Regions:
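Metallo-beta-lactamase
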Residues: 1-15, 119
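Beta-strand-turn-beta hairpins that frame and shape the catalytic cleft
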Residues: 1-3, 23-28
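Conserved Rossmann-like nucleotide-binding pocket used by diverse enzymes
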Residues: 4, 30, 91
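Short, well-ordered turn and helix-capping elements at secondary-structure junctions
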Residues: 7-9, 32-34, 38
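A short acidic, often aromatic-flanked loop/helix-cap motif at beta-alpha or helix-coil junctions
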Residues: 11, 125-129
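Cap/insert and terminal regions of metallo-dependent hydrolase folds
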Residues: 18, 25-27, 35-125
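Conserved hydrophobic "DFG−1" position in protein kinase catalytic cores
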Residues: 20-21, 129
């Protein structure tokens, strides 16, 4: 197994990392907690699976909006990232639904720009590339 770490941006944290795992001709990229960054797209070069965190919906106030946009990736932004990265499978995890959304709306928002397969992961799910 080859493991490659790459820098991501998670708000005010000085260091935050994503990871790419390569083994037996398959590759998985895990974003970690991050706002949209090009390093995720670059790490996905030819990847089988992108596992990425996401929030969807509208923050309730300006403070929450600033927090989410600095620390996390919206469903719309994730769609753009996945469209550029072109993973064979997008796995959504660490899903934060805000007040005016649900899982179906989140997937719909991602599919506005990414037209590939999406799995919404739950704790303890086992998903193979």
């Amino acid at each position: 197994v080859k493991v490659t770490a790459f820098a991501v941006k998670h708000g005010s944290w000085k260091e935050a990392l994503g990871y790419r795992f390569d083994a037996d001709g398959k590759s998985i990229v895990i974003s970690g907690d991050t706002r949209p960054v090009d390093s995720v797209v670059e790490a996905c070069n030819g990847c089988d699976m992108l596992v990425h965190e996401v929030y969807s919906g509208t923050p309730t106030n300006a403070e929450d909006a600033a927090y989410f946009s600095s620390f996390h990736t919206s469903a719309e932004q994730l769609g753009e990232i996945a469209a550029k990265a072109k993973p064979k499978l997008l796995v959504v995890w660490h899903y934060v639904p805000l007040r005016d959304t649900n899982e179906a709306k989140m997937v719909e928002a991602i599919h506005q720009t990414f037209h590939g397969a999406i799995v919404v992961a739950n704790d303890l799910d086992v998903i193979s590339p």
